[in-house]
Amino acid sequence: MTQTRIVPVILSGGSGTRLWPVSRESFPKQLWALVSDRTMIQETALRANGPAFAAPIVVCNQEHRFLIAEQLRNAGIVGARIVLEPVGRNSAPAIAAAAVLVAEEDPDAVLWMMAADAAIADVPALLTALDSAVVAARHGRIVTFGMRPTAPETGYGYIEQGPELAEAPGVHAVARFREKPDAAAAASFVADGRHLWNSGMFVFTARTLMEELDAHAPDVLPAVRLSVAERTADLDFIRLGVEAFSACPSISLDYAVAERTHRAAVVPADIGWSDVGSWSALWELGAKDAAGNVTLGDVVLESAENCYVRTDGQLTAVVGLKDTVLVVTEDAVLAMHRDMAQDVKKIVDRLKAAGRPEATAHKRVHRP
């Protein structure tokens, strides 16, 4: 049966350690409402919910399966297939499993791969860009979304765009992928107008992805095919074969395929995208008062400027601080300069090394 509708594939395997102490492995950031009154995974699923889309496939680890199923139901998402990874193997095996499942029905179906935890301000612009990406995907391209940079960000990878594709107006060949740059290189990328932030969203047909995995990462697909063949049904969940999936290399789709294939393309998009990868990113996204402060919860400020203050319970008062992040949870407090937001992971690593339960779990266990 030919699948004319786009199949959303939502990857929900991250732990979001840079948003500790709110995001932890047991309840990561995609399960929290951080930028709206819906959780991140609900917002992601709702962007791809309508007549143009098939029911989503969500790939996650088994510990989160009931929480994700409940959140999707509460958002009105019907018929989602939730695929359980027995172990984390990064994005290439995860999306390959979804592609193999879809290819059983229609190898030429178009898949839209996206992370569960990104924020997008302009959904209509996103869907317009998606239309262009689908045209290129149906011509055998692996299409990513490139975000026009608004600042010389060193925390993102960049894509250098090449010429526009004749068969897909608005979509460009990829000249090259670039690793996260230093500050000087990032500034030059922004200035030249040819470079885009790599969003990590991709559009391709199941057939194209599997062909490119075979060509560029031949260890991935055989193990994934076997794990899908050995799958079992568990309530509404799909459990992949443990031994076969565990044999997959741990590799991202960028490294496995996107940076190696000659079929890579990019659609430039101005959609207000953020990977919400740090507390400073949440400050940038948040509604600010006249002094540039973002507050959530029971917060009182005096002479504070450009701060992000969040409390999940107790009254939190801040006096005279600038450019500070203060996050208060039931069992942990994080205080830091906003410019150090990428270093939160170092704290989590130290807590793990010390055997502290706060590194990975909340004091209160969340049950659906």
Task: List each language-model region with its residue ranges.
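Conserved N-terminal catalytic core of the sugar/cofactor nucleotidyltransferase
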Residues: 1-10, 17-28, 33-125, 131, ...
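Left-handed beta-helix
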Residues: 2-5, 208-368
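Short coil/turn connectors at secondary-structure junctions
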Residues: 4-6, 53-54, 77-79, 106-109, ...
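Alpha-helical scaffold segments in soluble metabolic enzymes
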Residues: 18, 30, 43, 47, ...
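A short acidic, often aromatic-flanked loop/helix-cap motif at beta-alpha or helix-coil junctions
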Residues: 88-93, 151-153, 183-185, 273-274
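A residue-level structural signature of the nucleotidyltransferase/glycosyltransferase Rossmann-like core
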Residues: 111, 194, 201-202, 274, ...
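Conserved core of the sugar-phosphate nucleotidyltransferase
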Residues: 123-247, 265
